[in-house]
């Protein structure tokens, strides 16, 4: 597929243009057929592009937006009062067909509320959910939901499993992704009523490859392709994982810097350490998909660096190339036709 167009919320995130513009430059250099609609305050975007010598780049088009959704703004306030925000206009561009996807590092709650209002959910889906990758011993696994819904019933968790499974089938060409339900133990007697009801629904659905309960350590074992949980638990697990990865890398760096002997050992181990850093670096897994919408929306971590935001853009490109929305919609329609979804 050529001429992919992505709308970028250029003003969102903790760092705004300082990170977004360099990341966009990296993305277009890697993708000659990629066009980016940079949404935000025109003068500021122009100045940033000029600073990086990219003002005349044909792969960039500036779309002016006079407002910015702040990171601490209430979603309801952003939805009602920020109709000319960079976030809102970027999502509108997807609805209007001028962009095939949207990427934002902005306020998660506001992004979810705005995307749901503008794009609407797919038939059979009550709530969108956030899904992203985590590194494992054997490669990677995906986790859904990572914070879109902090209180989900069994029916919603079942819908998350359907959407996550469809995403993996589309992107990784796996016909039967292994699905695990996050719980405090693998025994059937463990868990609250919500988890037990979800487990029963998944077990009764022969269409999906449900393998049972998984515990927190299964995030990294690679035993399953998709871990299903509510957004409260998923978000806590994600942030804890990112913190642990940073701690491990920091401790290793300090350990090899203690004296001349450890510095020599560090030089010898440098190739292995670089490999470890690449495997664990959270920026390499940045870019979470908002599944269940009539359009592609990718959420970048608010504090992402250039590499991280670039990965979020490339995640959007990947989803466009693989027609993720259409494939998820087809999967959901199959479930509706079989009476598995209402």
From Swiss-Prot:
Q: Tell me which stretches of the chain form a coiled coil.
A: none
| SUPFAM superfamilies linked | Isocitrate/Isopropylmalate dehydrogenase-like
What EC number(s) does the entry state? Answer: 2.3.1.274
Could you tell me which Pfam families the record lists for this protein? FA_synthesis
UniProt pathway: Lipid metabolism; phospholipid metabolism
Compartment(s) of residence: Cytoplasm
One GO term of the biological process aspect: fatty acid biosynthetic process
Keyword annotations: Cytoplasm, Lipid biosynthesis, Lipid metabolism, Phospholipid biosynthesis, Phospholipid metabolism, Transferase
Question: What are the record's GO terms for cellular component?
Answer: cytoplasm
Q: Tell me where it mainly resides.
A: cytoplasm
Q: What class of enzyme is it?
A: transferase
Describe its partners and assembly state.
Answer: Homodimer. Probably interacts with PlsY.
- Could you tell me what this protein does? Catalyzes the reversible formation of acyl-phosphate (acyl-PO(4)) from acyl-[acyl-carrier-protein] (acyl-ACP). This enzyme utilizes acyl-ACP as fatty acyl donor, but not acyl-CoA.
Q: What does the similarity note say?
A: Belongs to the PlsX family.
Q: What is this protein called?
A: Phosphate acyltransferase
Q: What is the source species?
A: Legionella pneumophila (strain Corby)
GN (gene name): plsX
């Amino acid at each position: 597929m050529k001429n992919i167009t992505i709308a970028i919320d250029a003003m969102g995130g903790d760092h705004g243009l300082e990170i977004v513009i360099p990341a966009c430059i990296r993305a277009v250099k890697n993708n000659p057929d990629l066009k980016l609609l940079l949404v935000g305050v025109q003068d500021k975007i122009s100045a940033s592009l000029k600073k990086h010598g990219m003002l005349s780049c044909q792969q960039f088009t500036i779309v002016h937006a006079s407002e910015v959704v702040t990171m601490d703004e209430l979603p309801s306030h952003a939805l009602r009062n920020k109709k000319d925000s960079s976030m809102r206009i970027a999502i509108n561009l997807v609805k209007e067909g001028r962009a095939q996807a949207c990427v934002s590092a902005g306020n998660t709650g506001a992004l979810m509320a705005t995307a749901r209002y503008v794009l609407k959910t797919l038939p059979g889906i009550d709530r969108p959910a956030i899904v992203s990758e985590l590194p494992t011993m054997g490669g990677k696994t995906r986790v859904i939901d990572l914070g879109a819904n902090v209180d989900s019933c069994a029916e919603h968790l079942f819908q998350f499993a359907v959407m996550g499974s469809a995403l993996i089938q589309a992107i990784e060409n796996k016909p039967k992704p292994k699905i695990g339900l996050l719980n405090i133990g693998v025994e059937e007697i463990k868990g609250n009523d919500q988890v037990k009801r979800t487990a029963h629904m998944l077990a009764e659905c022969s269409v999906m490859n449900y393998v049972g309960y998984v515990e927190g350590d299964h995030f990294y074992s690679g035993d399953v392709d998709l871990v299903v949980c509510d957004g409260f638990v998923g978000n806590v697990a994600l942030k804890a994982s990112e913190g642990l990865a940073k701690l491990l890398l920091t401790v290793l760096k300090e350990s090899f810097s203690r004296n001349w002997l450890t510095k020599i050992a560090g030089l010898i181990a440098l190739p292995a350490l670089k490999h470890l850093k690449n495997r664990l670096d959270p920026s390499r897994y940045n870019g979470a998909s908002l599944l269940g919408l009539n359009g592609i929306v990718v959420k970048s971590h608010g504090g992402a660096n250039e590499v991280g935001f670039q990965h979020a853009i490339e995640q959007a490109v990947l989803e466009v190339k693989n027609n993720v929305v259409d494939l998820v919609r087809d999967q959901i329609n199959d479930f509706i036709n079989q009476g598995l979804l209402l």
